[in-house]
Amino acid sequence: MTKILVLYYSMYGHIEALASAVAEGAKKVADVEVTIKRVPETIPPEAFTKAGGKVDQSAPVASVQELVDYDAIIIGTPTRFGNMAGQMRNFLDQTGGLWAEGKLYGKVASVFTSTGVGGGQEMTITSTWTTLAHHGFIIVPIGYGIPEIGDISQMQGGTPYGASTIADGDGSRIPNENELKIARYQGEHVAKIAKKLKD
């Protein structure tokens, strides 16, 4: 059984929605077990609520040590100034012990994100790849494997690096169907590769 972790941070629910779609896609692949977890919140609860953060996220919180249990990890993070969110950064910064022992070496990884218009979706994904490369992950982009990536009939996310969604300033725009299709494709694509490598 190939084990896949969809690991995310979501403040307003955009990444949470993409994470569900990624997991849905991965579950299409036979003999694959998919788990969705989120990283711990670092913003004090009162401040998080005041900022409009989505408090009713059902995914359990992940621990750093459990990362070794998975064959593939698909990371979802919103953009913060062209980088991953601080909550994801804080979580990954705690993987030094795993790095020192090579515990994540050779595992599969992929990244998806949410940004504002011109917010750096590609930069966020590729800057997250840097951390993954230091661990020796096999990084899986999605290329142009799904036609929705090239759809210019509407404003949308989606890059050859990974799925994404465009979030407006007040968080009211939710992922559209094309963005969710791309996320499902990413999950399925990564699951197929992880399974092949494990077999």
UniProtKB/Swiss-Prot annotation:
Binds 1 FMN per monomer. FMN binds at residues 10-15, 79-81, 134. Pfam families: FMN_red. Keywords: Flavoprotein, FMN, NAD, NADP, Nucleotide-binding, Oxidoreductase. Its EC number is 1.6.5.2. GO terms for cellular component: membrane. Substrate binds at residue 99. NAD(+) binds at residue 12. GO terms for molecular function: flavin adenine dinucleotide binding; FMN binding; NAD binding; NADH:ubiquinone reductase (non-electrogenic) activity; NADP binding; NADPH dehydrogenase (quinone) activity. Coiled coil: none annotated. InterPro entries: Flavodoxin/NO_synth, Flavoprotein-like_sf, Flavoprotein_WrbA-like, FMN_Rdtase-like_dom, NQO. Residues 4-190 form the Flavodoxin-like domain. The keyword NAD applies. It catalyses: a quinone + NADH + H(+) = a quinol + NAD(+); a quinone + NADPH + H(+) = a quinol + NADP(+). It comes from the Bacteria. Its cofactor is FMN. HAMAP family: NQOR. Belongs to the WrbA family. This is NAD(P)H dehydrogenase (quinone). It comes from Photorhabdus laumondii subsp. laumondii (strain DSM 15139 / CIP 105565 / TT01).
